């Protein structure tokens, strides 16, 4: 049987909130089987827990935010969720003492490191996969996103930015998911933004924690970061990273192909909601043998060496 996973022990880290600019402490803890991913605001009294479900994503402007019925929010979850998805973590309690997850370096890599430091433990329950059996597609103008049947998890993603630096880079990527491919080729890709937008956001008390320490910043012509890019195609890779995180609020690893053109947090979430609403388009499956699993998650003991 292929088992569910959680972390072996609690792990904690501190970073900066992208929008507030304030210090944020994050704590990732083990959780029992079938818990899923639950986020908890410990700065509130009493503390408030929000399950990571598609219908709890109620804001997608510049990030993905979970918001409960009382309006309590936890923002910027997507990079952490990409790491959870990439390492195949099914169950975890994530405590945070602020209304946002720390931005860290703008990628998923610090969260991958945290999860590897905590260790990954298999649990005595079958891991469930969300298998796509009929295509589901959402559109917004010329932007679109689609999930369709595929034996594995494949991503086919295209961006289209009218900027000389991005135009010079590869704006289309196809990848077959595996933990090692995610960690090596995707997880280090940072969020990116334009100087003109950052100035506007700061004038409106947003992105106060944003800097070249946690984002690729571009002016009208070039990348301003002194060290340049981590990957030649870092822009499209970061959009794929975001999509991994956004899709994980479906609650399970997906078996299927995700194709997208110019999509972002809003359309990604619309796709997950449309999928879950169309109950004949998917089924939950589990596997008895490693050889039968179409999505390759590295065994826990090997993760530390990726």
Swiss-Prot record:
Per the record, the GO terms for biological process are: lipid A biosynthetic process
- Gene Ontology terms, MF aspect: metal ion binding; UDP-3-O-acyl-N-acetylglucosamine deacetylase activity
Q: Where does Zn(2+) bind?
A: 79, 238, 242
Q: Which organism is it from?
A: Shewanella frigidimarina (strain NCIMB 400)
List GO terms (cellular component aspect). membrane
The record's listing under HAMAP family reads: LpxC
- Pfam families, alphabetically? LpxC (PF03331)
Which chain positions lie within coiled-coil regions? none
Under catalytic activity, the entry for this protein gives: a UDP-3-O-[(3R)-3-hydroxyacyl]-N-acetyl-alpha-D-glucosamine + H2O = a UDP-3-O-[(3R)-3-hydroxyacyl]-alpha-D-glucosamine + acetate
Q: Which SUPFAM superfamilies match?
A: Ribosomal protein S5 domain 2-like
Name this polypeptide is given: UDP-3-O-acyl-N-acetylglucosamine deacetylase
Q: Which family does it belong to?
A: Belongs to the LpxC family.
Enzyme Commission code(s) on record: 3.5.1.108
- Catalytic residues per the record? 265 (proton donor)
Q: Which UniProt keywords apply?
A: Hydrolase, Lipid A biosynthesis, Lipid biosynthesis, Lipid metabolism, Metal-binding, Zinc
Recorded superkingdom: Bacteria
Q: In which pathway does it act?
A: Glycolipid biosynthesis; lipid IV(A) biosynthesis; lipid IV(A) from (3R)-3-hydroxytetradecanoyl-[acyl-carrier-protein] and UDP-N-acetyl-alpha-D-glucosamine: step 2/6
Record's function text? Catalyzes the hydrolysis of UDP-3-O-myristoyl-N-acetylglucosamine to form UDP-3-O-myristoylglucosamine and acetate, the committed step in lipid A biosynthesis.
- Needed cofactors: Zn(2+)
Q: Which Gene3D superfamilies match?
A: lpxc deacetylase, domain 1, lpxc deacetylase, domain 2
């Amino acid at each position: 049987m292929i088992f569910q996973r959680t972390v072996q022990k609690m792990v904690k880290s501190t970073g900066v909130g992208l929008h507030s600019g304030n210090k944020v402490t994050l704590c990732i803890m083990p959780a029992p089987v079938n818990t899923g991913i639950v986020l908890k605001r410990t700065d509130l009294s009493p503390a408030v827990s929000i399950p990571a479900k598609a219908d709890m994503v109620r804001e997608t402007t510049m990030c993905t935010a979970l918001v409960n019925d009382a309006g309590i929010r936890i923002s910027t979850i997507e990079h952490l969720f990409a790491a959870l998805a990439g390492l195949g973590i099914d169950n975890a309690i994530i405590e945070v003492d602020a209304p946002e997850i720390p931005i860290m370096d703008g990628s998923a890599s610090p969260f991958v490191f945290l999860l590897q430091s905590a260790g990954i433990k298999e649990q005595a329950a079958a891991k469930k996969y969300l298998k796509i059996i009929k295509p589901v597609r959402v559109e917004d103008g010329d932007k679109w996103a689609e999930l369709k049947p595929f034996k594995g998890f494949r991503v086919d993603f295209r961006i289209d930015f009218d900027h000389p630096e991005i135009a010079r880079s590869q704006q289309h990527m196809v990848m077959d998911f595996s933990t090692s491919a995610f960690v090596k080729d995707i997880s280090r890709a940072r969020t990116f933004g334009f100087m003109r937008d950052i100035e506007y956001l700061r004038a409106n008390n947003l992105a106060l924690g944003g800097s070249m320490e946690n984002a690729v910043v571009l002016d009208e012509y070039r990348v301003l970061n002194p060290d340049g890019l981590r990957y030649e195609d870092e822009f499209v890779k970061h959009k794929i990273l975001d999509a991994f995180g956004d899709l994980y609020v479906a609650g399970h690893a997906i078996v299927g192909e995700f194709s997208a053109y110019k999509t972002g947090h809003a359309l990604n979430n619309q796709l997950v909601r449309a999928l879950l609403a169309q109950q004949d388009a998917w089924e939950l499956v589990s596997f008895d043998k490693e050889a039968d699993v179409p999505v390759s998650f590295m065994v826990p003991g090997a993760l530390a060496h990726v």
